Amino acid sequence: LELLRASVSAAGHTLAAQRVEEGQKSIVVRRLCEESLTKFLTYLNPSKIMDSLMEFDRIVEQELGKSFSNPIRIRIIVHCGCALERAVTRTPLVYEDSKKDIDTQKLAAIQKAVKVFEDALKLHFSEDELYFMAKMI
């Protein structure tokens, strides 16, 4: 019984340490994305959209059942922030590759996650923007 308690306690500490490490990685990702978006965006304030962007990332990872590497997270979050600006300026990207080659599970995860922006910011992405995001992940 003592061995079981010690094992459970050690597992709990390991899990807690992993959560702290993940939290620190999220802070780093958030800061890097916010700094990048400050350079790229003209109309949107990155500090005001970061919560929505981080929630978008969380939902996509949850829907796909995987954790993205930090470089992929940064790329998708920055792309998404720029896509929000394109939604504001009504200058969406045009996806010219074959849409039937896109992973439908990834596209469905993106479609669910963008509801964050529709609800919080009343901004909608073009279908082509969604295809670009699905291709990125």
Question: What spans do the regions from the language model cover?
Answer:
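A cross-family "folded-core" feature that marks the main globular domain of proteins
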Residues: L1-I137
